[in-house]
């Protein structure tokens, strides 16, 4: 339906312009048909820093064009027409999933025919298009179909390296010869990529790096022998069950042995870096070549993850040099924004050593550590740098923990931190900055404003032109007459917690309404943010039924509130969260008389499902109905890296694991509880649900349960799943938590 017709329909529903709230249709909410926003899509800045490229559909001819835009004036040029992305053997176009440029922008690597590996489509086929002669050919043709992973050009664009079936290969683009660099890859020896737990918890997928001179490949190797193997049963796709086996180290058990080494692109033996420490009880989550050098910069975490040791290893040697250690009594994080300064004399480093997360400048020998940002606020992430002006651009939000803004600071010398984002745009700002720091694609949104995307220039954050204002989506949102998300505060003891709230349709402040609380509550996420979330249409749908939507940010959540806020929960995950949720909703009821404390519901997914259970079991007088989805019932069941980071091992902290696990308090259930889990969840295993069910049955506790066959942690695969899930949730709320004002 075109916008004019859609708007007419809405106005008719509104009774000729009334601002009454439209009754949302759940099918349309799930299908994403109600508010449609436009974005930039995938883009890449080109090496000149003045142009960026995008993949765009060629509507007239079909297929995909690679198009460049000049940042200054939006001059558009088709760099590679869709007609070049054709398989000459078949005459058919090759679908473009994504592209990557060579360093000199002379060639493009095309990723296609992709397959999912756990979370993402990281396995597929690759083709190379050479702009000099317009040739287009597939690489790795001798390997099995859709088996290549993480292909990337050598620095001089003469070769491409890739992983296939746990081995690393290098293909010469001129001679088309292929050199196999590793030969020991197997089910248990993994070269150039990672096992399940490194991928999930360290975001490690691409496991090899080209040396700057193109003569060596450095890579990770994981030996999963001895790691516990988890079995998932597929009962729905064949007459007899199929078993999926994969190594999964649960808290306190044996990890894979991980090491790093380097090998010549001409072949030969791998030189392994001799980093001290048991490879099964230390982690190597990050490794990169220092720019324009033959040296590797390696981060090593100990198993408790409370120290991060930095090593430099030179090609030609197996002995690394230890230069720097960051440590914390709770845990430290890996550094993903390392930038080298002044001809590699210094590098940037993020640390919470001052009590706040800040960016530091560290000398190459690790002896001189100076703050680049400082103050009682958290640096969040680096956006880019202007090396000529000696500036770093970064995200922070000193005055409002739910928002995000761009700031700048000097890399050397003293100077005040300067806000760059416009003062009149309250919400969250994100940026894709050019390599020179001169231009950036800027996206602004807040809870009631769809993304507004413009090109800005620096210095000065000047808006050069609008790229997408999403005016149509804004009009669609406003035409619905939805209640806005409000941001308020609630107390938990002496702490002030951030809270967001949506009031029901036809709200009457003199009546009392039931509340549905959405919780996550664990260190890996945050739920109270002033950012566009598609209009919060699922929550708005439930609000339409006569509920108040609430989310409370408890201690330990990943909010920019300082080290103590985030790490006070160390060793006690699951304890403070439910305490803050209970205190928070009670304080809200003291502030707002329209909250009905006799009708409080709570729901969450993953860690939020765990906290839902903790709240239901430990505070049954506060929480009366709960829906727990894809939850961890016993913290011992989850993986080593995540659980031990925040809890240490079960052997070292048995009481913390007992107190933080919902299953410990299952006998406390008094209210209505719906358990939802996918049997194909490789992340939080269905075992977690079954163990809790077993315990609830033992205690004679009544509950409801929905199991989704072979759905993963997101419970979205297979036809009809998402709609069925949301319908089931809505039905349960309406049947067990009476809606409407009283």
PLM regions and their residue ranges:
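Hydrophobic alpha-helical segments, principally membrane-spanning helices and signal/leader peptides
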Residues: 1, 196-198, 646, 663
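Bacterial N-terminal signal peptides that target proteins for export
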Residues: 1-7
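N-terminal alpha-helical segment
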Residues: 6, 22, 608-609
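Hydrophobic alpha-helical targeting segments used for export or membrane insertion
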Residues: 7-13
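Beta-propeller folds
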Residues: 9, 20-430, 438-439, 445-451, ...
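N-terminal signal peptide c-region/cleavage motif recognized by signal peptidases
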Residues: 15-17
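Serine-hydrolase catalytic core recognition
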Residues: 229, 285-286, 293, 422, ...
